[in-house]
């Protein structure tokens, strides 16, 4: 905190620092000084801002630094030390999660669907402290088809009917009743049919106008693949205790579908599917998740990479307003230089296409100048000097 008489002095320092420091840092410093429990004097305000400016200035790159190459090296080199395995998730046998190098490759390749899509779903206050209520939400999320609750099926050729033997344990586990199964079948357009229920949860589905066994088998497959409840893409939903609350971990991801389920805290839903984040929340959120996912992958492997390198990778991937991969179909493939594109991948194709189009190489970048042995415009090469032999 500060004296009332020093408030105007703090505002003046904030105004001066705004010309040097980023706005976010200035605001954080102001809040820190204003909300500190002990009294902060004018001298201390000066020291805080001077130290912040000094640290910030030392953290800036030198003009002409090849930041792209440094970032590529700083993220890529630790990647060679990563493991190549898919791990079980936090002691849960049913869920696998891709970590290490395969996950890093997925992120920078901007894959539409990760190899192990998953979500971490937080619940609202009404649901997060009650396990039964959390299980209720999990059952709403888990995509359940009729085949998931059937122990066996058979076909009675004499009566042209399909017999489904329902599994009592699976019905209980999935939170599904026999009536739910009947309703799902009745929603199908199968022509004229009657469902008879017998003891032991056995359903006998008789058809009036079916005279072919092949047609009966097709109908059976259609019935087994019929949705009873849940959200498409969510194969499993498992309730886990985290601290003093229950959360739901899912095998599979469907962000837009999950947000519409009652009991889900929409402000805290997480998914490892970057494309879904982009579609639902936009490019800024996608950039944030790229940063978070790369940082998480590196941290899990015990690798320490400066955050600025990761930020640069995320910025390059999202700078056009859509998520692009770092590869020949994305960032690298869109370079203006013919030689730079050819140096990366499929060399002959790039050269032939460029020749057919009549492209001109302007030698403005780094790669193309190195290829032909020209000095590059980086570091001291950025400075152009003209010598005057006689100076009067």
Swiss-Prot record:
The keyword Transferase applies. GO terms for molecular function: DNA binding; DNA-directed RNA polymerase activity. Disulfide bonds: none annotated. It is an enzyme of class 2 (transferase). Keywords: Cytoplasm, DNA-binding, DNA-directed RNA polymerase, Nucleotidyltransferase, Transcription, Transferase. It is found in: Cytoplasm. It holds the Pfam family RNA_pol_Rpb1_5. DsDNA binds at residues 106-115, 145, 189, 218-226, 325-329, 345-350. It catalyses: RNA(n) + a ribonucleoside 5'-triphosphate = RNA(n+1) + diphosphate. Its EC number is 2.7.7.6. Coiled coil: none annotated. GO terms for biological process: DNA-templated transcription. Its main location: cytoplasm. One of its GO terms (cellular component) is DNA-directed RNA polymerase complex. InterPro entries: DNA-dir_RpoC_beta_prime (IPR045867), RNA_pol_Rpb1_5 (IPR007081), RPO1C (IPR012757). The keyword NADP does not apply. Part of the 13-subunit RNA polymerase complex. HAMAP family: RNApol_arch_Rpo1C. Corresponds to about the last third of the bacterial beta' subunit. DNA-dependent RNA polymerase (RNAP) catalyzes the transcription of DNA into RNA using the four ribonucleoside triphosphates as substrates. Forms part of the jaw domain. This is DNA-directed RNA polymerase subunit Rpo1C. It comes from Saccharolobus shibatae (strain ATCC 51178 / DSM 5389 / JCM 8931 / NBRC 15437 / B12). The lineage of its organism: Archaea, Thermoproteota, Thermoprotei, Sulfolobales, Sulfolobaceae.
């Amino acid at each position: 905190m500060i004296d009332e008489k020093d408030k105007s002095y703090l505002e003046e320092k904030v105004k001066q620092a705004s010309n040097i420091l980023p706005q976010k840092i200035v605001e954080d410093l102001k809040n820190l000084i204003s909300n500190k429990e002990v009294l902060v004097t004018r001298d201390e305000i000066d020291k805080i801002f001077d130290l912040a400016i000094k640290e910030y200035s030392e953290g800036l790159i030198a003009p002409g630094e090849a930041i792209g190459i440094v970032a590529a090296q700083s993220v890529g080199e630790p990647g060679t030390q990563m493991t190549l395995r898919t791990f079980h998730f936090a002691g849960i046998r049913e869920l696998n999660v891709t970590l290490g190098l395969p996950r890093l490759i997925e992120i920078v390749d901007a894959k539409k669907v990760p190899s192990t899509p998953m979500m971490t779903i937080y619940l609202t206050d009404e649901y997060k402290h009650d396990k039964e209520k959390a299980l209720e939400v999990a059952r709403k999320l888990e995509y359940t088809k009729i085949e998931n609750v059937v122990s066996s099926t058979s076909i009675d050729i004499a009566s042209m009917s399909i017999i489904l033997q329902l599994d009592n344990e699976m019905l209980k586990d999935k939170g599904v009743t026999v009536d739910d199964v009947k309703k799902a079948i009745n929603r199908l357009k199968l022509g004229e049919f009657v469902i008879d229920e017998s003891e032991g949860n056995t359903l006998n589905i008789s058809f009036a106008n079916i005279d072919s066994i092949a047609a009966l088998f097709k109908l059976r497959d259609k019935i087994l693949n019929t949705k009873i409840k849940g959200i498409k893409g969510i194969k499993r939903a498992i309730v886990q205790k985290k601290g003093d609350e229950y959360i739901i971990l899912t095998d599979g991801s469907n962000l837009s579908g999950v947000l519409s389920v009652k009991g889900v805290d929409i402000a805290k839903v997480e998914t490892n599917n970057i494309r879904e984040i982009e579609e639902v929340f936009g490019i800024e959120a996608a950039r944030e998740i790229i940063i978070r996912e790369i940082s998480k992958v590196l941290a899990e492997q015990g690798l320490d990479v400066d955050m600025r390198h990761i930020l640069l990778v995320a910025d390059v991937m999202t700078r056009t307003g859509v998520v692009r991969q770092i590869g020949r179909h994305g960032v690298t493939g869109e370079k203006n230089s013919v030689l730079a594109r050819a140096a990366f991948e499929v060399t002959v194709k790039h050269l032939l296409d460029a020749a057919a189009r009549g492209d001109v190489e302007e030698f403005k970048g780094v790669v193309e100048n190195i290829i032909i042995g020209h000095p590059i415009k980086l570091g001291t090469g950025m400075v152009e000097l003209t010598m005057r032999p006689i100076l009067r």
